[in-house]
Structures are given as C-alpha cells and as structure tokens.
Amino acid sequence: MKLSLNTATVRKQWNLAQMIDGCARHEIQGISPWRDQVAQMGLSQAKKSIREQNLTVTGLCRGGFFTAKDWKDDNLRAVEEAHELQAQCLVLVVGGLIPGSKDISLSRRKIRDGIAEILPVARKAGVPLAIEPLHPMQAAERACINTLEQALDICDELGDGIGVACDVYHVWWDPKLQQQIKRAGKKRLLAYHICDWLVPTRDLVSDRGMMGDGVIDLPLIRSWVEGAGYSGFHEVEIFSELDWWKKDPDEVLRVCKERHNTCC
C-alpha cells in the first residue's frame, strides 16, 4: 500500500518546499499539506512543485470549525484551494462547542448545517469532504463529532460528495469501529491516517507515537479498512512535540517508511 506524508509530521523542521522535496527523495508518493504551509509557499507554487514531483495530494488539511463565527468564508476558500491542488479530499475538523455554550447537541446540529451549506459548492468543485472524527478528549475545543458512527450519520443524511477520514489515533478505542468501517465502505472511506497511541500520553494533541511504538493494533484496523474496499494511500500523521518534531526530518521519513512496511 502506498504511503502519504501528512506534513504535520515534520512541520517544525521543514517548510512545504522541503517537504515536497523530501517526499520525492524518500520515494513517498503522496502528500497531505496543511493550508498554512500552502499559504506560506503560495498556492500556485505549491501546486507546481507538487506536480513536478508527481505527488498525489491525498488530502488538504483542513476545513471545518463550523461553530466559529467566520466559518463559511474560510471553508469556501478551503474548497477552492483543495480544487486547485487536485486534493483527493478536504479534511474537516468540524469544531467543538459553540463558544460560551455547553450544549453539545446544538453544536453538533450547527456542524451538520454548516457542512450541508458548503457541500453543494464542494460537489461542484469536485472536492469530496472528509469528516474526521476526533477523540472525545478533543470534543470541547476541536471536534464534537467523535465516532465514525456520528460522522457517517451525517454522511447518510447529506448524500453524495462526503465521507470520512479514518484516523487510527482518534478511533482505535471505539467498540463499534469494525462495524462502522464496514458501514462506510469504499464510497465513504476517503482517507486513512496512521500513527500510534503512546502509553502514557503526555499531551492531548502533540504526543502521537510512531507506528509500532504504541498500543494500536494497526494490522487489524488495516484489515478492516481494506476489507471494506479502501485501496487508497496510508497517510502518516504524527504530532510529536516531545520526540519526532525534534529529530532530523530525513530520519523521520526513513522511519515512517520502515514502520509502515513492518508495523502496519
């Protein structure tokens, strides 16, 4: 299975131009850039450089945050950027609680309505929207869609042009995971993100592990994903303030490739 680099993995060491070059040198065939990195490089130059290296843009990170005040304009720009980069999907980190509110049900309804509002624009642009459920520990601040089941309920309600990004870090614990991956199937599984869950976890956001260093049964989840019809890239996404962000980025990419072959 082909490997893609989510650029968060080396964001503290390299800019986007260096990441694109690094993927080419390490024969990593896919890349999933973050919008701030694209903006820093310039959209046109990023598009040109990615194409010159024959990289597949497996996703653009990110749209979402539908509970924020300025969500609409930013998401419309994100769709446009994803279209220009020919991204296979626009990843949505949907947003946490409405500011000042404790009503998680209301927040989830607002998220559903926001996605419904931008979906016709995304369909017209040919950009699939990928809802990424986040671990419940991030429900308040980042995403109050926390399981594949919740995400797929929205997908089923809204129809075509929308699916899920299955990030093992966020969903490995879910007792319904196998069932919901099967439910998603080839149509809804738009992205598959890999890393590992460390014990102990020292930070709620930035202490992900390299594949093989934690407790996630990656081969098992891979078998479920592939059994459901997914044949796309495996996208490594590691936020690691205390470890991998401090290492030489070429070494990080080398280990990513090695662990993908041996642990996933």
Per-segment meaning from a language model:
Residues 1-27, 53, 80-81, 86-88, ...:
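Histidine-acidic metal/acid-base catalytic patches
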Residues 32, 59-61, 91, 130, ...:
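Conserved beta-strand positions in the central sheet of alpha/beta enzyme cores
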Residues 49-73:
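Short hydrophobic interaction/assembly module
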Residues 67-163, 173-174, 248:
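Active-site acidic/histidine proton-transfer and metal-coordination neighborhood
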Residues 9-11, 35-39, 63-66, 94-98, ...:
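Active-site-proximal loop/turn and secondary-structure-junction residues that shape catalytic pockets
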Residues 32-51, 98-103, 138-139:
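Glycine-rich, proline-tolerant flexible connector loops at the mouths of alpha/beta enzymes
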Residues 22, 26-41, 59-66:
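N-terminal substrate-binding region of glycoside hydrolase catalytic domains
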Residues 43-53, 114-124, 180, 220, ...:
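Catalytic-core regions built around general acid/base machinery
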